[in-house]
């Protein structure tokens, strides 16, 4: 049995740890609130640009923009979104496990795919396994602005247009609620499906100067918005996962403290009983 000093030391250290995890839980809750607000605020813009792109794309019968045309898939790019830090439960491991399994199942060689890594955890994961990384972005912070990822998104879209890869898939954690996040894979390029408009145009447009030039500007913005929206979604998921992980850690610490306190009291009671027994035994020996 551990000594009273050892048990007391463990109780003290566990209490200090629980104070840290409790503080991290509260910080993550505040960050989650802001991240969720940012994601929800971006949703109306995303819905509107999707509607406009759908209507313009359906109306421009003669448009042959490369972002709208499916081609033979020789190489697929996977844009994988993770965090820069850990202590977020299964947030990173679940999305990386899904991305890794998908790549292994779909591709026979490294020439058939490439990875675009957002987040230090994901970047390090793919580097460790010597998987091809086309580009990376780390150190974004807790509140991401479009300006921070503008270069990456534009380069990614341009590389697709230039033929560096033939499909682009997003792999990230979709925010469902504070206690639930779902790993999501979404094909971004080529833009062959504009969502839930039922295949019917909801508006018609007159193009000036023509539909080709309108799509030349609109389609890259739409693809970039899809990536940015997924990143906002992932950030909310990250803070939710970290808040949940820290809450679980705090609860576990409390249970451990209760268990250690019980062990401490039992050990102390046993020590007192032993001392009383020795005193009584010594007194009896003197009689």
UniProtKB/Swiss-Prot annotation:
The family database entries (SUPFAM superfamilies) matched by this protein are listed as:
ATP synthase (F1-ATPase), gamma subunit
Sorted UniProt keywords? ATP synthesis, Cell membrane, CF(1), Hydrogen ion transport, Ion transport, Membrane, Transport
Supply the InterPro entries for this chain: ATP_synth_F1_ATPase_gsu, ATP_synth_F1_gsu, ATP_synth_F1_gsu_CS
**What membrane topology does the annotation report for this chain?**
Peripheral membrane protein
The compartments listed are: Cell membrane
A Pfam family assignment = ATP-synt
* PROSITE patterns registered for this protein in UniProt: ATPASE_GAMMA
Instruction: Classify the source by domain of life.
Output: Bacteria
Major subcellular location class? membrane
GO CC annotation: plasma membrane; proton-transporting ATP synthase complex
- List this protein's GO terms for biological process: proton motive force-driven plasma membrane ATP synthesis
Role this protein plays? Produces ATP from ADP in the presence of a proton gradient across the membrane. The gamma chain is believed to be important in regulating ATPase activity and the flow of protons through the CF(0) complex.
**Oligomeric form and interacting partners:** F-type ATPases have 2 components, CF(1) - the catalytic core - and CF(0) - the membrane proton channel. CF(1) has five subunits: alpha(3), beta(3), gamma(1), delta(1), epsilon(1). CF(0) has three main subunits: a, b and c.
Give the NCBIfam families listed for this entry.
Answer: ATPsyn_F1gamma (TIGR01146)
Q: What is this protein called?
A: ATP synthase gamma chain
Task: State the organism named in the record.
Answer: Bacillus velezensis (strain DSM 23117 / BGSC 10A6 / LMG 26770 / FZB42) (Bacillus amyloliquefaciens subsp. plantarum)
